[in-house]
């Protein structure tokens, strides 16, 4: 009969291990870590005497205080079973490249409940074993080598209590199973001494650990406890507590959330699946991810709406917002801010609540805070619960993204009718990534009509191309995007798109304002003006009556009927003002603009209806939000002082007025006073760019104030790219109104 070599790392608990091994027939032979050489151990093995090795607990750090232990482990892996206890576990993890660091808690002579995976050394042992702990160090999940998997953790804090090699018969526990206060210690030792040889499977199949290359099947639950005591279980438990606390707060109680939804306090939805399949390229689900359990902090100070705009303007089809606060450092407020930030885009990305959704309440939360879809993780939900949550989400108009990790989970997802399925390449139990997971699941899909997405570990165009060739329609990318130095360029490179470039604009449009008669209108139209402005501000010198305005409108609409529009499909990547200026530029010309100043909204709406205005210009202190209630595009005037101070509202705010007009700070406010402001201020505003574009997309403006045929060319040149229209009134007038030669000269100076 062979023996068990027990390496003593100078710890009194070694003799407890000796007693347990002896009682179950392990025939232990004890030697201290500096009293034996590797050559001697090799000789024992060659002689057929050595059958297994145990590395004992001990003080200190494995690199400095474990003697021959690390060398023995390196030699013995793949040859014979190895069990590490406390210091023994730390030796194994450290040897294989993991990090041994502060466990987050100091436990000396304290007990904790340990939950485990019920296989290997834990075969047939009950869940929630009371265990004795004497340590302050532990393996760190973030750095755990991919060849190791977590087998057990403490129930209350999730500290790693056990690891196992995926290929070799190497097991380790952090706690002390040999202590008289620990449960199941001799059962654990009995399991260990039954193991044979150096690899799982074969004659070790009895203990349930799959051999290398075998598919690990989902474990049954034991006594109601989760079969895999991993980070996933910790998150599951914490999210249940989080939801319970949220439901107790009056403002976020289930009743109040439901009432808010019934009042349509939530933003409007778009169809998640349609947004995915309508994308002309591979759909990118770009994730906002500050941290993760496997990587720790990634971008802890990242602004969610700022990151979302980068993603959206680069062409993302979906923005995934992690709302889990403890491990991922996200929040529901992040998601609401993201939703608001992209709301003004013409074809905005769908918003995904990326969380561990466990209840209908969490789906209601998602809907209220701006999500278009939610993530349902098959691994976290019982089949009946999965079906109930899927159906409930669909009833709210949100087709869920259903996450799977293997063909068994895929079958469950298909059974409930999932239309969009994501394959997580990351195993949520140990957070290791296997990029072939998507390929295996895709093969099991057998061509079914679902939108398949790959969800983890994607960091290059080659990764994406591999999946696209297999029929994958979308990819979720998080960490790689969060770490990218140029987010937009990197996102586009993933799907083979060129970097974003600003398309040079044609020469600016021309607006002739202060039209007072049909004669003025005729000469402006004849000269080629694109927009004609009529002043409808009582008490100003160019104000005209409603009847005159109607006559001018009839003339303008007649001219428009003889012109043609340019077909325009709004770019997926264009921000608000760029999109609106492109749309206005593409319309039939000329367009009639009614100018108002500090008049009531009802007066403005009446004038639009009675006169037939194509646009409205708000020239006073009107709220920008009025633009939502005016049925035609709105030009909002902002006044620029000689010092460059801008007044009139939030000039770069998207989603309200369709156009920005820069004018000098006048007295009457009716325009046409012939005063200019320094055009370098216009250039500064233009170059500040659209919100979220980081200055790469100029802010389109209408330039007004003191322009003449003589200076308009200089004004355009000094203000720079971004002037999409110039506005003139007094600069083309004489004593009797508009002067034909001046109007023609102005248009010619603009167009060259």
Curated annotation (Swiss-Prot):
UniProt KW Membrane keyword: no
Classification via Pfam families: GATase, IGPS, PRAI
Region entry Indole-3-glycerol phosphate synthase, spans: 231-495
N-(5'-phosphoribosyl)anthranilate isomerase: annotated segments: 509-752
SUPFAM superfamilies: Class I glutamine amidotransferase-like, Ribulose-phoshate binding barrel
Gene3D superfamilies per UniProt: 3.40.50.880, Aldolase class I
Positions of the Glutamine amidotransferase type-1 domain: 3-202
Keywords: Amino-acid biosynthesis, Aromatic amino acid biosynthesis, Decarboxylase, Glutamine amidotransferase, Isomerase, Lyase, Multifunctional enzyme, Tryptophan biosynthesis
Biological or metabolic pathway of the protein: Amino-acid biosynthesis; L-tryptophan biosynthesis; L-tryptophan from chorismate: step 1/5; Amino-acid biosynthesis; L-tryptophan biosynthesis; L-tryptophan from chorismate: step 3/5; Amino-acid biosynthesis; L-tryptophan biosynthesis; L-tryptophan from chorismate: step 4/5
Catalytic activity of the protein: N-(5-phospho-beta-D-ribosyl)anthranilate = 1-(2-carboxyphenylamino)-1-deoxy-D-ribulose 5-phosphate; 1-(2-carboxyphenylamino)-1-deoxy-D-ribulose 5-phosphate + H(+) = (1S,2R)-1-C-(indol-3-yl)glycerol 3-phosphate + CO2 + H2O; chorismate + L-glutamine = anthranilate + pyruvate + L-glutamate + H(+)
InterPro entries hit by this protein: Aldolase_TIM, Anthranilate_synth_II, Class_I_gatase-like, GATASE, Indole-3-glycerol_P_synth, Indole-3-glycerol_P_synth_dom, Indole-3-GlycerolPSynthase_CS, PRAI_dom
CDD domains: GATase1_Anthranilate_Synthase, IGPS, PRAI
GO molecular function: anthranilate synthase activity; indole-3-glycerol-phosphate synthase activity; phosphoribosylanthranilate isomerase activity
Stored PROSITE patterns: GATASE_TYPE_1, IGPS
Annotated positions binding L-glutamine: 58-60, 136-137
Enzyme Commission identifier(s): 4.1.3.27, 4.1.1.48, 5.3.1.24
GO BP annotation list: L-tryptophan biosynthetic process
Residue numbers annotated as active site: 86 (nucleophile), 176 (for gatase activity), 178 (for gatase activity)
Protein purpose: Trifunctional enzyme bearing the Gln amidotransferase (GATase) domain of anthranilate synthase, indole-glycerolphosphate synthase, and phosphoribosylanthranilate isomerase activities.
UniProt-recorded name of the protein: Multifunctional tryptophan biosynthesis protein
Organism for this UniProt entry: Cryptococcus neoformans var. neoformans serotype D (strain B-3501A)
Gene that specifies this protein: TRP1
């Amino acid at each position: 009969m062979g023996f068990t070599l027990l390496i003593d790392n100078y710890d009194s608990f070694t003799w407890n291990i000796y007693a347990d091994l002896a009682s179950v027939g392990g025939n232990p032979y004890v030697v201290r870590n500096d009293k034996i050489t590797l050559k001697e151990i090799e000789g024992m093995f060659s002689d057929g005497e050595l059958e297994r090795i145990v590395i004992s607990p001990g003080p200190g750090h494995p690199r400095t205080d474990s003697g021959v232990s690390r060398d023995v482990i390196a030699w013995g892996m793949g040859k014979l079973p190895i069990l590490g206890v406390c210091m023994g576990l730390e030796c194994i993890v450290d040897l294989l490249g993991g990090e041994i660091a502060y466990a987050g808690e100091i436990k000396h002579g304290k007990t904790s409940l340990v939950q485990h995976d019920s296989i290997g050394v834990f075969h047939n042992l009950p869940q929630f074993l009371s265990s004795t702990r004497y340590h302050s160090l532990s393996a760190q999940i973030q750095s755990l080598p991919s060849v190791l998997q977590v087998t057990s953790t403490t129930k209350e804090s999730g500290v790693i209590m056990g690891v196992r090699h995926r290929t070799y018969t190497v097991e380790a526990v952090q706690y002390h199973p040999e202590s008289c206060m620990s449960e199941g210690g001799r059962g654990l030792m009995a399991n260990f001494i039954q193991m044979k040889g150096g690899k799982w499977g074969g004659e070790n199949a009895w203990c349930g650990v799959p051999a290398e290359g075998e598919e690990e099947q989902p474990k049954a639950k034991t006594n109601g406890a989760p079969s895999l005591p991993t980070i996933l279980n910790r998150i599951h438990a914490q999210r249940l507590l989080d939801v319970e606390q949220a439901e107790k707060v009056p403002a976020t109680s289930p009743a109040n959330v439901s009432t808010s939804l019934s009042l349509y306090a939530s933003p409007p939805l778009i169809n998640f699946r349609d947004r995915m399949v309508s994308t002309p390229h591979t759909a990118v689900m770009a994730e906002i991810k500050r941290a993760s359990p496997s990587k720790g902090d990634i971008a802890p100070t990242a602004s969610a709406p700022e990151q979302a705009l980068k993603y959206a303007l680069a062409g993302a089809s979906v923005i995934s917002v992690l709302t889990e606060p403890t491990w991922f450092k996200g929040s529901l407020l992040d998601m609401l801010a993201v939703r608001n930030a992209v709301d003004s885009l013409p074809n905005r990305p769908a918003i995904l609540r990326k969380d561990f959704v466990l209840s209908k309440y969490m789906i209601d939360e998602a809907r209220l805070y701006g999500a278009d879809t939610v993530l349902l993780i098959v691994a976290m939900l019982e089949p009946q619960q999965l079906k109930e949550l899927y159906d409930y989400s669909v009833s709210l108009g949100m087709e869920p993204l259903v996450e799977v990790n293997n063909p068994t989970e895929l079958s469950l997802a298909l059974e409930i009718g999932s239309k969009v399925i994501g394959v997580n390449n990351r195993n949520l139990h140990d957070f290791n990534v296997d990029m072939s997971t998507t390929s295996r699941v895709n093969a099991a899909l057998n061509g079914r009509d679902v939108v398949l997405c790959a969800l983890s570990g994607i960091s290059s165009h080659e990764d994406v191309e591999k999946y696209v060739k297999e029929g994958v329609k979308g990819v979720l990318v998080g960490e790689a995007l969060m770490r990218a130095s140029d987010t937009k360029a990197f996102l586009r490179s993933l799907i083979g798109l060129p970097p974003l470039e600003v398309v040079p604009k044609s020469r600016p449009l021309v607006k002739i304002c202060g039209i007072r008669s049909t004669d003025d209108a005729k000469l402006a139209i004849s000269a080629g003006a694109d927009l004609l402005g009529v002043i409808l501000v009582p008490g100003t010198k160019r104000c005209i009556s409603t009847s005159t305005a109607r006559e001018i409108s009839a003339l303008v609409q007649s001219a428009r009927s003889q012109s043609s529009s340019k077909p325009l499909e709004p770019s997926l990547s264009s921000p608000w003002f760029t999109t609106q200026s492109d749309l206005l530029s593409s319309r039939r010309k000329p367009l009639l603009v009614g100018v108002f100043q500090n008049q009531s909204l009802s007066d403005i709406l009446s004038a639009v209806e009675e006169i037939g205005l194509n646009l409205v210009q708000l020239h006073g202190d009107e709220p920008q939000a009025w633009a939502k209630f005016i049925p035609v595009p709105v030009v909002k005037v902002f006044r620029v002082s000689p010092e460059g101070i801008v007044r009139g509202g939030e000039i770069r705010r998207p989603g309200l007025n369709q156009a920005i007009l820069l004018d000098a700070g006048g007295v009457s406010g009716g325009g046409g006073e012939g005063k200019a402001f320094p055009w370098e201020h216009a250039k500064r505003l233009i170059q500040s760019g659209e919100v979220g574009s980081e200055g790469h997309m100029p802010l389109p403006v209408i330039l007004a104030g003191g322009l003449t045929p003589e200076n308009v060319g200089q004004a355009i040149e000094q203000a720079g790219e971004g002037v999409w229209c110039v506005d003139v009134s007094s600069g083309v007038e004489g004593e009797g109104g508009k002067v034909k030669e001046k109007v023609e000269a102005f248009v010619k100076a603009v167009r060259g």
